Amino acid sequence: MPRSRINGNFIDKTFSIVANILLRIIPTTSGEKEAFTYYRDGMSAQSEGNYAEALQNYYEATRLEIDPYDRSYILYNIGLIHTSNGEHTKALEYYFRALERNPFLPQAFNNMAVICHYRGEQAIRQGDSEIAEAWSDQAAEYWKQAIALTPGNYIEAHNWLKITRRFE
């Protein structure tokens, strides 16, 4: 049974109803409809913290979805789950894959920067300043890209870039 039929959350039910209406109105192929259903069910499972179920739905959605823009959001959400699970290498891979299909995802650049910054902080705690600097430099590059795409957002990152003298 599709997740949209079992979810008790009012907002999720409302979203599901609107999404189902749009799927009937907008001319789409059955494959596109099926991909969207898996994506929607993945988002619902993810919002409830059911990451294994969300990943299953997202993987199926990526198998069916042919539009690069839509695929980018599926891949981005897979990256979010891997980030939440502490699987940073996998998360970075999925953020990269999302950006290959849609280079205008500032949130992917931001999340990549956060992971790099975290790894830099880990290196500092381990006493490896050279590795820490490399990770911090990489974080700076990703934050610059996120800020360039959405000026005025990512204020904390912008301040960090200024404080660390990495902002040009």
UniProtKB/Swiss-Prot annotation:
One of its GO terms (cellular component) is chloroplast thylakoid membrane. InterPro entries: PSI_Ycf3_assembly (IPR022818), TPR-like_helical_dom_sf (IPR011990), TPR_rpt (IPR019734), Ycf3/AcsC/BcsC/TPR_MFPF (IPR051685). It is a peripheral membrane protein. The keyword Plastid applies. Coiled coil: none annotated. GO terms for biological process: photosynthesis. TPR repeats lie at residues 35-68, 72-105, 120-153. PROSITE patterns: TPR (PS50005), TPR_REGION (PS50293). Pfam families: TPR_1. Essential for the assembly of the photosystem I (PSI) complex. May act as a chaperone-like factor to guide the assembly of the PSI subunits. This is Photosystem I assembly protein Ycf3.
